[in-house]
Amino acid sequence: MGLALGLFLIVIAATGSAIAFYKEMERALNAHMRMVEPQPQGWTLQDALKIRARLEAQDPHSSVFSLQLPQNSDEALFARVMPAIDPKSGREYALDYDELFANPYNGERLGRRRIGAATFHLEGLPSFLYYLHYALFLPFGAGILLIGILGLVWLVESMTGFWLTLPARPKKSKKGASPRPFHQRWASAWKIERKGNTNRLLFDLHRAPGLWLWPLLAIFAITGFALNLGGPYAHTVQRIAAYEHFQEAPPRETLPQPLINPPINWFKAAELGQRYFAQQAQREGFTLGKPAAIEYRRDLGLYFFLMHTSRDLLDAQGRPTETDSPATAATIAIDARDGRFVGLQLPTGQRAGNTLTSWLIALHVTAVGGRVWQVVVACFGLAVVLGCVTGLWLWWRRRVLR
């Protein structure tokens, strides 16, 4: 198990080091899709929803189910796409892309892609690394499941490794001398001895960084589980703390049949979302920022309207955290059948489990801490690679000696 985990972690940690700068990579390599020229007239939420409808109409086989709204004037509109359902057969159409980019000012379609698609073009590198990091390029569901399980295994392995570094209980001295204090006997595990032989150096390189970085190991192992297996994570956290996540543990059961054309359309859902947020802000005592995203789950018959609020985590510049899936934004769930308010989910200050999870995930995806934290995460990934490589080398040396 440890051998397989080490091999997988090398890939996960190496790609994680790179995508710590995912946003910068996207801006550098995909400026034609990600960046636009700011216009003085600006754009409105209604404009964005009209563009969404236009994008969907351009390909009747597509269903634009998620719209992420730009937070800066030079950013493109980002949409997630899934196959539409053929009304005759009841099956999904074949679709060779799942992301769309458009100019929020004029609706111009800037590009499309399938996340993680293998390509020899540099513009596909960020998406490829991102997909490799969280799905190992296995079929979508299998890769995500495997990474989630590996997160748990990694946590257990890390705890076991930490325990193994603890010094053994000292034997009683016949001469009655007092044993060295615990911290002195443990100190050697935290050091890298450069004067020893190669095996000792490799062992220290495997052990010492793991001790120094153990808090980060625990954070990234837990969040790897949370990001990939959100449902089991939600059910686990709910046993020990108040926690709610509409996407991973929906507030209602899956419908018998997908609700394709709901009575409440996107425009009405956005209107209701803003109204409900104004009511909840007054009730819960938070202030409202910009709308972050709007999504529709046809399997649940629910809209999710996301908005930045004073309960958001903030980045190094004091702005609300923002990723391709703004999980740290507040979310309101709306029934697509009658427009009923279903629930509110705040990133902080509402439920202890949500507050802790928001912080952990924001650290994982480098949404907080600015450039300094990005560098820390990148270096941490390289340290994990070093620990795995030295561990595999030591295993191989022992096997040869046997």
Language model: regions and residue ranges:
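Conserved histidines in hydrophobic membrane contexts and catalytic metal-binding motifs
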Residues: M1-R402
